[in-house]
Structure formats: C-alpha cells, structure tokens
Amino acid sequence: MTTQSQGGGLLHRLAQGSLVKQILVGLVLGILLAWLSKPAAIAVGLLGTLFVGALKAVAPVLVLMLVMASIANHKHGQKTNIRPILWLYLLGTFSAALTAVLFSFLFPSTLHLVAGATDITPPTGIVGVLRDLLLSMVANPIDALLKGNYIGILVWAVGLGFALRHGNDTTKNLVNDMSDAVTFMVKLVIRFAPIGIFGLVASTLATTGFDTLWGYAQLLMVLIGCMFLVALVINPLIVFAKIRRNPYPLVFACLRESGVTAFFTRSSAANIPVNMALCEKLNLDRDTYSVSIPLGATINMAGAAITITVLTLAAVHTLGIAVDVPTALLLSVVASLCACGASGVAGGSLLLIPLACNMFGIPNDIAMQVVAVGFIIGVLQDSCETALNSSTDVLFTAAACQAEDARLASHALRN
C-alpha cells in the first residue's frame, strides 16, 4: 500500500511539476546518452518521433475547433486584436530581413558549394508562391486537416464559425465542449515533452553529430547571431513600442516555454499546441490567440527571412557580385514576402532561396547548391529558425493583447 502511494505521489509530482525543468533534464539526459552509447541514442529517437507525430496530429484539429468555437460564440461588439497582431508579424519579419542584410555586410560569408539536390523543385517566382497560398485557401477541408494545411484549415474554420453564429445555443455549446476536449488532449500530449525532447536530442546527436558543421562555422555564426539579435534586441524594441514597459519578462517567458520546445521539434505546426497553452497561461484573450497563433505559424517567419537573406548574400559574396544599398533593401522586401509564403512550400525557407538568388542573376544550378548547403547546416539553422518563428507568434500576440488591456483600463479610469 505504501509503495502504491509513493508511486502515485511520484507520478503526481511529475504531472504537476515544472515542464521547463523537466525538459532541461530530458535535454541533459539525451546529450549524455548520445555520448555514452550511439546505438541506444538512435533507438530512443522513436520517443522523439512519437512526440512530434502526436503534436502534428493534434494541432490541425485544435486549430479547427478553437477558431470555429471562438467565432461561433463571438458576441456582437466584442473586439479582437487580429489586425495589430498582423502588423506586428509583418514588421517583425521585415525587421529580421533588414537585420540579416546588415549582418551579412558586416560579416560577409562565403560558401564551399557542393552538388545541389536535383529531386527538389523550387517555386518559379513570387507569383508562384502567392498562387500556391491562394490555392491552399480553397483546399478540401479533410485534405487540409490530413496535410496540415493551416491556411485551408483557417478558411474553413472561419467560414463554419460564421455559419454557426446563426445556430442554436445547444450547437454552440457542443462546439465549445469539443474545443475543450481537444484542448485537454493537447495538454496531455505536452506533458510528454521532456520524454520527446530526450529522444530527439539523443538521436540527433548520435546520427549527425556536429563535425560537418565546423566547415560552415562562420556562416552559422552569422545566421544564429542574427537570430539572437532579433530575439533579444529587435523584437523587444517592437514589443516595448507596443506595451510601453519592460518587454524582457514577456520575451524570456516566450523563449523559455515556446522557443525551447520549438527548437527541438523543428516544426512551427507541431508547436501550435504549446503556444496555445502558453497563451492560456498568460491569460490572453482566447478569441484572439485561437486565430493569431495558427496564422502566425503560417505567415510570421522572421527566422525564414533571415535564412533566405543570409544564404543568398553568402552566395553573392562567393561569386563576387557587387550589391548596392537599394538592391539590399529590395532583397529585404523579397525575403520578407518569400518568408511569409514559406509554410506553403515543401522544404520551407531553403527552397525559396533560388527566388532571392534570381534577383542577382545567379543560375538555378548554383542556387540549388546553396540550398544543399542549407540542408547540411539544417540541424542548427532549422532549429534556431523555428524557435524564433514560433516564440515570436506568442510574443506579438501577448503584446497586442496587453496593449489593448492597458488601453481599456486607461479609458475606464478617465471615465
């Protein structure tokens, strides 16, 4: 009996304990296992695969139900903050691209070009990217759920939500209950994050190591340094301009609870449930974050803008092409537009590099070699990119919600 109660007490402590501390323990154990036994580390990679698979499985249903329930139960006259969040997303992405241009000129990198992959096809132009985004809006809803097409899911969720506004209260309550049930499943999956990250870290270190990355040390330093600058300086400045108080407690909370998980899952879509849970913890408006978080996972791509810009300018420096200031500014705009469409392209930000390279007349075969370099450094580049993208979704959502709360409180005091 005593053993059972002790076991129950241990499980209770694990279930109610700090998730961040448990993730750090999983991280350390994963590194140790990869160091001690590569075969065992590769074997436990299944735990990471299962965790990421569970997150990807629950995320589309979560987005559909939350957005649908939010709009169906939206009261007339009740205000959401989607527009200011959209502006923050766009400003953050463009600022990241500008920062990447500045870093690339201050610390010019060159590439050891390798054979590019021939079995992947990049988009043919920005028009092609925008066309793919528009087509994803009219996707079959079942197909959108199966493939994780969040633009299509959002369109259907918004449409069904507006249609259900005219339904009776029983129907609306059912939608709310379904939303709560999916949220419960999400919380259950997130509790397994320490085990999942343990498996991901162990298998990644065991299979790839970091030996191949040393040849691209400077390029990685420019990429990661730029992402750190955006996360710790540029984004806090944008948030400060919005909320008019110290932004760093909010910034560090988002990096700690969203960025860490996103770093290891390397998937903005898989991190949507984590971000939703963090928004709830921050007591943000559910009607707002249920739309802004999946939307951010689709279009808020500061990390992708940095990757596209830095790798393109590295190719430019390698080939000795001169770049003036207006062209660099135009590259920032192009990289921002490409980044916003990265979620609709198989291969993400890397396969949009040929679009940016095309601005400088770089042939497609060389551009695809740059893409191949991107895949080589992807272990770190993609992890940092996803961590920046996903944590910024919560950061800007929280900033807009808190600014609106402060405005309403100030208005109430004046009256």
UniProtKB/Swiss-Prot annotation:
This is Serine/threonine transporter SstT. GO terms for cellular component: plasma membrane. Involved in the import of serine and threonine into the cell, with the concomitant import of sodium (symport system). One of its GO terms (biological process) is serine transport. One of its GO terms (molecular function) is neutral L-amino acid:sodium symporter activity. NCBIfam families: PRK13628.1 (NF010151). HAMAP family: Ser_Thr_transp_SstT. It holds the Pfam family SDF. It is found in: Cell inner membrane. Belongs to the dicarboxylate/amino acid:cation symporter (DAACS) (TC 2.A.23) family. The lineage of its organism: Bacteria, Pseudomonadati, Pseudomonadota, Gammaproteobacteria, Enterobacterales.
